[in-house]
Structures are given as C-alpha cells and as structure tokens.
Amino acid sequence: MNETIFENLPQKMNLISDLFSRVVFRDKEACQDLVKIILGEGYEVTGVTSQYDITNLQFRSVVLDILAETAGEEPIHVEFQISDDDDHMRRVRYCNGSIDTHLLQKGKAYKELPDVYHIYITMNDFIGGGQTVYEIFRTVRDREGTYSTQYLVENGVHELYINLEIPLDDGSELDHLLRYIKETTEENEDACFGPVSYTHLRAHETPEHL
C-alpha cells in the first residue's frame, strides 16, 4: 500500500504554504474546484501554470503562485501568503500590471483587454476589518468627500482578499475549503472538504514532488 502525502509531509505543512499549494493547484481539476468555490459558477479553467515567471529585464520581475486561464481567456491569479512582511495590496497592483503587459497585442484596443481576477489568500486579517473575505470595488468620490456607487467605474480588475484568521463558521463550501487550507490533515479532509483534497493530493505522494 502506497504511503499517502500526509505521511510524507513535513510537520505543519499546510496548503497555505506556497510550496505545497503550487504543487496541488497546478492540477487543473483541483484549481477548477478552488475557482468554483471562491468565484462561483461560470469560470471554466482551461489551463494552469504554477510559479508563473514574468521576467522584466529593467525592473522587478514577479513569480505568481498560480496563474489559471479560463475558456473566456480571463487570467485568474491565485496567491498564498503566510508572512506580513510586505504590502500585499501593492504586490497585487504590481502583479496586475505585469500580467496586463502580456495580455494585449500591439494594435488592439484597450476595450479588448480581458478581465483579470486576483484571489489573494493570507494567514492573517491584514486589512483589519474583522471579515474573512474582502472584495475590492472601485467607486467615485465627489468634491465634498461623498462616495457614490451610482456610476460604473469598473476597469476589469477583480480583487478578492481572503484570510484564514477570521473563520466563516457558516458551514459553506468556502468555510470548509479555508479550514482545509489552514489545517491540511486527513481528519480535516474527512470533516471539511472533499473535491480538492485527497483525490488530488494522492497524485503527489512522494517527497520529491514538494
């Protein structure tokens, strides 16, 4: 009988670790499950690349944990961050700019630039609002300082910041998934979440995969 990945994992190795998550979620089916639970139906993942390197010869290059592409050619960037030693939102801003430079061919109109999705999963609630999920919306502020949602100011960038510090505790699939990412154990797999778990993890049973 083959050993399972749980028997081979270093102590305290969980899916929040980018080392582990990039191995698991480069599997298209696992990534599809992740995207479906977080973004909802309607996003068919057609390809996945882990550790996607965007090289810049003059300025800082970036390496994305997971970059998926949908049937609608919309990039979905998934990032896992344990530490709080940098500015997460500015990191996403820089990643977005780097992705954009590879999306629009010369001669194309800006309106042809596809939507891009950022799913940024952190250990801590760095925003500090006491919420599990933060979705960023662009809005308008007038000269009196009043914010209005009356005007459509979307630019095609979708940002979701999800933390593992504040549990949802609502029994939803997302609740199960986040608990499983935080504590990736066989016990939690059985109690919490199935589709992204054992089936895909068993494909990476030996230490050399990590």
Residue ranges and their predicted role:
Residues 1-204:
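Elongated, amphipathic alpha-helical interaction scaffolds
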